[in-house]
Amino acid sequence: MKHSEKNEIASHELPTTPLDPVLAAGRES
């Protein structure tokens, strides 16, 4: 079950998340 946890963390650690375009745009600004 550690793989699942790593996957979740990686998804949240992604610099540019497709689910959060606003966040990505704000970071790019």
Swiss-Prot record:
Localisation: Cytoplasm
Cofactor: [4Fe-4S] cluster; [3Fe-4S] cluster; [2Fe-2S] cluster; FMN
Description of how the protein assembles with itself and partners: Tetramer of an alpha and a gamma subunits (flavin-containing dimer), and a delta and a nickel-containing beta subunits (hydrogenase dimer).
GO CC field: cytoplasm
Top-rank lineage group of the source organism: Bacteria
Comp. bias regions, Basic and acidic residues: 1-11
Keywords attached to this entry: 2Fe-2S, 3Fe-4S, 4Fe-4S, Cytoplasm, Iron, Iron-sulfur, Metal-binding, NAD, Oxidoreductase, Plasmid
Primary localisation category: cytoplasm
Regions annotated as coiled coil: none
EC number(s) stated in the UniProt entry for this protein: 1.12.1.2
Cofactor detail note: Binds 2 [4Fe-4S] clusters.
GO molecular function: 2 iron, 2 sulfur cluster binding; 3 iron, 4 sulfur cluster binding; 4 iron, 4 sulfur cluster binding; hydrogen dehydrogenase activity; metal ion binding
Similarity section: Belongs to the [NiFe]/[NiFeSe] hydrogenase small subunit family.
Catalytic activity: H2 + NAD(+) = NADH + H(+)
Name listed for the protein in its UniProt record: NAD-reducing hydrogenase HoxS subunit delta
Gene: hoxY
Signal peptide extent: none
Species of provenance: Rhodococcus opacus
Disordered: annotated span: 1-29
